[in-house]
A protein has these predicted regions:
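Ribokinase/PfkB-type carbohydrate-kinase core domain
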Residues: 1-31, 43-190
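Peri-catalytic substrate-binding/gating loops that frame the active-site cleft of hydrolases
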Residues: 35-42
Length: 190
């Protein structure tokens, strides 16, 4: 019989760098239409916060049993604190570059009967200190076996080529999860 084995995720620390965001959900019942506009009124009964974007990638890596490290950009606010707490509870070592002048990106979904009624985005692209982010990443590369770049076009990976070159100089494989508009990674860039 053929013997299958799972990879040893616990022996491959992974560094995720990218656009972190908070996915916030408000759940409630709808029982009437608003008199102000033809929209349902939701009476919020519960809410939940989940790591989104690159933070969700790191969360999934940790769930597989790997040591997950995360570098990203947030505001200095309640949403960033919620993200940090959720990630810490899941075993993710999150290191945020916190910016005073901008809020953490939040995607708020209003749900009723397991149906999304509305999504509200609280975001503006981050104007990051790309050099400082690169220093943070380079200081962690000695601890990891894989670098994952998770780009949602929100500004954290403005200087992705520097990160790729630093990883390749250490023979660390780079995986890219580009969702942004301009993310040209080609194999010939070695």
């Amino acid at each position: 019989p053929m013997k299958l084995s799972m990879p040893r995720f616990d022996q491959a620390p992974v560094l995720v760098v990218g656009d972190v965001m908070l996915d916030r959900y408000w759940h409630g019942a709808t029982s009437r239409i608003s008199p102000e506009a033809p929209v349902p009124v939701v009476r919020v009964e519960q809410h939940e916060d989940r790591p989104g974007g690159a933070a969700n990638v790191a969360l999934n890596i940790a769930a597989l049993g790997a040591q997950a490290l995360l570098v990203g950009v947030t505001g200095r606010d309640e949403a960033a604190d919620s993200l940090a707490n959720s990630l810490k509870a899941a075993g993710v070592d999150a290191r945020f570059q916190r910016i005073d002048s901008q809020p953490t990106i939040v995607k708020l979904r209003v749900m009723s009967r397991h149906q999304q009624l509305l999504r509200v985005d609280f975001e503006e692209p981050f104007r990051t200190d790309a050099a400082a982010l690169a220093v943070d990443v380079e200081s962690l590369l000695a601890k990891v076996k894989v670098l994952v770049l998770s780009d949602y076009g929100k500004g954290a990976l403005q200087n992705h080529q520097v990160l790729i070159q630093a990883a390749r100089a250490r023979n660390i494989p780079v995986l890219a999860d580009p969702k942004g508009k301009d993310f040209a990674i080609r194999s010939e860039e070695r």
